[in-house]
């Protein structure tokens, strides 16, 4: 019985420490990149909260391979019209082509331009303060499918 209780307590502590570590990484990421997201909101009318949320998820708080080696914080893949640098990475398929950026700010700017395509134009009728509407709208428009 003592072993079971010990295992449960240790498991709980491990999960708690992992969650605290993840939260600290998220907070550090937001602190580091919030001004870039705010600038993108000013320039392109995309909520900074949405931009940061997508970057956090896609880049693992800036720790993913794409983020660290290609400055790609949004997992944006190459398209036929992409003339910039590329980075090969196995995501859903082996050796897929992803966009590579000179710096993180370029990744954020390209993400904004990506969302300004026709596919997402309905989102721009929403207020930048309507983050829930933007989140639902991105899903409905097929973002990240």
Describe the role of every protein-language-model region:
Residues 2-10:
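Sec-dependent signal peptide recognition
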């Amino acid at each position: 019985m003592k072993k079971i209780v010990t295992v449960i307590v240790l498991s709980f502590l491990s999960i708690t420490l992992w969650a605290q570590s993840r939260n600290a990484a998220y907070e550090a990421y937001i602190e580091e990149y919030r001004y870039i997201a705010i600038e993108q909101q000013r320039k392109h009318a995309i909520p900074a909260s949405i931009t940061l949320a997508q970057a956090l998820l896609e880049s693992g708080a800036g720790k993913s391979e794409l983020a660290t080696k290609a400055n790609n914080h949004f997992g944006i893949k190459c398209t036929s019209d992409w003339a910039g640098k590329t980075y090969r990475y196995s995501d859903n398929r082996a050796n897929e082509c992803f966009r590579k950026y000179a710096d993180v700010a370029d990744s954020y700017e390209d993400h904004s331009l990506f969302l300004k395509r026709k596919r997402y134009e309905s989102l721009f009728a929403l207020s930048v303060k309507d983050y829930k509407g933007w989140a639902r709208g991105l899903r409905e428009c097929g973002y990240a499918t």
